[in-house]
Amino acid sequence: MSIHPQLNKNGELQHLLTTEGLPVTILRHILDTAESFTGVTERDVKKIPLLRGKSVFNLFFEPSTRTRTTFEIAAKRLSADVINLSMAVSSQTKGETLLDTVNNLSAMHADMFVVRHNQSGAAHLIARHVGPEIHVINAGDGWHAHPTQALLDMFTIRRYKQDFHTLRVAIIGDILHSRVARSQIHALTTLGVPEIRVIAPKTLLPARVERLGVHVYHNMTQGLKDVDVLMMLRLQHERMESAHLPSTEEYFKYYGLTPGKLLLARSDAIVMHPGPMNRGVEIDSEVADGSQSVILPQVGFGIAVRMAVMSILAGN
């Protein structure tokens, strides 16, 4: 278990805050449960009653398209009542604290909070202060974590590669500002991936990133050699407080994934991206739309994975 406990006294998942320290049994249970939900999308009636009568509040303090939409779809397919709050026009803009906002919503008999916030630790703070009947899902907090994105990435890898124990995985791009990268590394390690590489210029890597058990490369030619899975990341300009790169054109020249660079990886390698993509910056359109790209299926799997997380938290 991590330093931010996510489990109740019975060892069951109470909140999903981070992939760090998440037991492998629970991680696999989420992936297996998600597998059972993939068929729901293909039905004429795309609903099952596992969360009927439950209220799910989406609290997004940062802009989001894929994450907020897939959480909403997932909750509705489980028959939950979904309340989407525009935090940009909420009482927070009038000076109300985060915990006061949550306490007021809890008084409205919320069952689950899905929280995205620009401050690291926001979801953990909420989880520590809500009652035991309420569950909190971290939908991304600052630079810290984005556990459901990492879980849907693991689901995607398992769908296409089956066995984690034989894989060589490369995460390429802005590792420094990426909560996704941190969550991916923890999940990949827990699932037994023997070699995780990070490829980025020195200015886009966290200090002492090697302590996470990854191999560091500053060169795509060496870093992509014989890789099975390529996980691309965008440049997070909104989190950059100073100049980390000379230009996006130069970044694309050295770190953008082109058809030529993709040839360095294994011939059956898959290309992933959590979105939003910046074509011509971290990835060439020919690769993004090519036969080795699994970027669109990756988005679709997010619904089943988020259904699984909410269902398990609700005790199903």
UniProtKB/Swiss-Prot annotation:
It catalyses: carbamoyl phosphate + L-aspartate = N-carbamoyl-L-aspartate + phosphate + H(+). Keywords: Pyrimidine biosynthesis, Transferase. GO terms for cellular component: cytosol. It comes from the Bacteria. Its EC number is 2.1.3.2. Pfam families: OTCace (PF00185), OTCace_N (PF02729). InterPro entries: Asp/Orn_carbamoyltranf_P-bd, Asp/Orn_carbamoylTrfase, Asp/Orn_carbamoylTrfase_sf, Asp_carbamoyltransf, Asp_carbamoyltransf_Asp/Orn-bd. Carbamoyl phosphate binds at residues 66-67, 116, 146, 149, 275-276. L-aspartate binds at residues 94, 179, 234. Pathway: Pyrimidine metabolism; UMP biosynthesis via de novo pathway; (S)-dihydroorotate from bicarbonate: step 2/3. Gene3D superfamilies: Aspartate/ornithine carbamoyltransferase. GO terms for biological process: 'de novo' pyrimidine nucleobase biosynthetic process; 'de novo' UMP biosynthetic process; amino acid metabolic process. Belongs to the aspartate/ornithine carbamoyltransferase superfamily. ATCase family. Catalyzes the condensation of carbamoyl phosphate and aspartate to form carbamoyl aspartate and inorganic phosphate, the committed step in the de novo pyrimidine nucleotide biosynthesis pathway. Heterododecamer (2C3:3R2) of six catalytic PyrB chains organized as two trimers (C3), and six regulatory PyrI chains organized as three dimers (R2). This is Aspartate carbamoyltransferase catalytic subunit. The gene is pyrB.
